[in-house]
Amino acid sequence: MTEPSNRTPLYVALIVAVGLVLAGGAIGRGFSDARLSDRYVSVKGVAEREATADLALWPIPFVAADDDLTLAQARINETTKRIRAFLVAQGLDTSQAQLGSLRVTDRQANPYQAGEAGRRFIVRQVLILRSTEPAKVLAASQRIGELVQAGVVLSSGEEYGPGGPTFLFTKLNEIKPAMIAEATSRAREAAAQFARDAQSKLGGIRQANQGVFVILPRDQAPGVSEEGQLQKIVRVVATVDYYLR
């Protein structure tokens, strides 16, 4: 009868030990990979373009006053003709000019103003010019004093905005793809430089945010708005996270 070998427990112990070593190595590599995946750099890339407004909106408010409402209305009609003639003389197409709603104020209907001196009826009107020739609109707006010299009584008010024409850039979608590509490329350049400085290698993208497009005035100064300038700056900032290896 053959006796059981005493070597069997030794073999089992060796197998278990080797298994633990292999498992420990796998776990170690797992922790190493986890730490590596947590290493990343967040960078920003900026792209800018100078753009010229391609649309102008110019509200021209005016007013007439008289004790006779019919005469006040007649003055409004005459003023409308003068304004249109002025715009045509500046080389502008008035086919896109529209009249806003007519507003009439009867001062005698207001008990707080009934005793004040002045014309009874005040008629307000606004002519809104829409033009795809912003440069001509700007030039015409700088000669608005000629209308005053011709007897036109210009008005103002919060409903008409800050005064003067508004210049808009409407072709943003045409330049978006190229600007996003440029911003992303600059972000990658910054990340690559960081990786070199950190003696690491640049990995793939962890997360990306293209940012929001903003339109700014080209010449920034107190009291100067973007909508009041022909020349503008379009800017986008892309934020990208890259893994480091």
Task: Give the role of each language-model region.
Residues T2-R245:
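Short, charged, surface-exposed interaction patches
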